[in-house]
């Protein structure tokens, strides 16, 4: 049994991870932690998240001594803020822990990226270079061998799973950048109360226009520029991404279908919709649903995921399963 610790356990993704660790036959939950100054320190996880009552009654502890915690675990999930993961990941790695980081602190291998999009200067270039990007369906071989997995972001997961099969097969005319319009549930903003996620204030609206940090993450890992506009939806969870692309000259609908089939024929967590995907079919699941329509030289691909699961926690667990050679669906379905 792999002793598994979750840092940032009080948040939505932390609670989802705790449930998956509880279900996993090869993992045992060794600790739940939050920052030293968190108001949640000392409370049980069941107090914070009623859905785990009767399953996980372990207290959420303040993280005050990283070395001691590291000595008592094999695996660490970091469901923490970007700058916190930036500081913690190298400490756990130095103690020989396997790290799965759900923040953006190690996703893009460019130090110049971080001051612009995350507001801090990256101090760990050696781990930035070694970290493997945790887009499970596309990076499995690298995930198997790396001690540091930077789990892909929520919007980037929904977007890349929709675009990569066509891009890899050369079916897209990239002189016309793919246009991604995506809507996320309010849980993507986290659990902390703000005006943005207040019940009476939430409305369908765009944000981060031309400057959202996920745009360069998507573009970097696709290898082509994109136009990305995120929207806040007035619902709890899920992401729906609608992506418009120009097909290369002469590309047929059959070639499109074959590209998707080839990319995901042995990937159990990507499903093809009979029509076009909808959030209600993927919320509370680890799946990504894809559907598309072709008209002339243009294609619209629609992608739906649960932002807290395939966009965060379940993809992290999927990466763990891949890394250790467990069945990919273990603890996920």
From Swiss-Prot:
Active site (record annotation): 154
InterPro entries to which the protein is assigned, alphabetical: AGPR_AS, AGPR_type-1, NAD(P)-bd_dom_sf, NAGSA_dehydrogenase, Semialdehyde_DH_NAD-bd
EC class of the enzyme, as a word: oxidoreductase
Domain of life: Bacteria
Subcellular location(s) per record: Cytoplasm
Catalytic activity: N-acetyl-L-glutamate 5-semialdehyde + phosphate + NADP(+) = N-acetyl-L-glutamyl 5-phosphate + NADPH + H(+)
Pathway connected to this protein: Amino-acid biosynthesis; L-arginine biosynthesis; N(2)-acetyl-L-ornithine from L-glutamate: step 3/4
Keyword NADP in record: yes
EC number: 1.2.1.38
CC per GO annotation: cytoplasm
Keywords associated with the record: Amino-acid biosynthesis, Arginine biosynthesis, Cytoplasm, NADP, Oxidoreductase
Any Pfam family the entry gives: Semialdhyde_dh
GO MF: N-acetyl-gamma-glutamyl-phosphate reductase activity; NAD binding; NADP+ binding
Listed GO biological process terms: L-arginine biosynthetic process
HAMAP family: ArgC_type1
Similarity comment text for this entry: Belongs to the NAGSA dehydrogenase family. Type 1 subfamily.
Biological role: Catalyzes the NADPH-dependent reduction of N-acetyl-5-glutamyl phosphate to yield N-acetyl-L-glutamate 5-semialdehyde.
NCBIfam families given in the database record: argC
Protein name: N-acetyl-gamma-glutamyl-phosphate reductase
Organism of provenance: Vibrio cholerae serotype O1 (strain ATCC 39315 / El Tor Inaba N16961)
